[in-house]
Amino acid sequence: KEKQKKLWPLMAAAASQDNDIRKYEEIGTHPAANHNAISAALAFHRGIGVERKVARLRFLRDRWAKRLLAESPRVKVLTPLDSPYSGAIGLVNVEGLEFDKLGGWLMSKHRIVNTPILHKEFNGLRITPNVYTTTDEIDTFADKMMYAIKNGIS
């Protein structure tokens, strides 16, 4: 508290706020879309229902994951596919592939959104479909992964 007076806020603050923690609050313009979309998003979520949403997300994840596992012994899915606590997210590892390069290739060449996970204990690509992801999009992802596994990326 005694250091507050000397520490400048990032945004302009009145001198009367020198000793007030609120001088660090940002009170600028905030995007209205976030606030305005909440009720529509909740209505959509409730319309689908939690059980159907989770079932759809698991179906999409399992569609690509089980295909890759069946088609290549180099594939490991690090997300437990049989866990009641998992849904859409799948972390896939392929022996011999560099995931930062693979992730960049998938995004730049094929516009497939992914997140390379580079960790001391494990590496892979995090793949996260959403309820509106089509089976054709999932199959395209699996096709491109199989291409990379068999031929490498260029």
Where are these regions (language model features)?
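Conserved core segment of the aminotransferase class I/II
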Residues: 1-47
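Short, solvent-exposed beta-strand edge segments and adjacent coil->beta transition regions
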Residues: 21, 85-89, 122-126
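Conserved N-terminal glycine/acidic-rich loop preference
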Residues: 31-37, 41, 87-97, 144
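Conserved PLP-dependent catalytic core of the aminotransferase class-I/II
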Residues: 33, 38-78
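A general structural signal for well-ordered alpha-helical segments in protein cores
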Residues: 35-38, 65, 99, 103, ...
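Conserved PLP-binding catalytic core of the aspartate aminotransferase-like
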Residues: 58-62, 69-109
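PLP-dependent enzyme catalytic core of the Aspartate aminotransferase-like
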Residues: 108-154
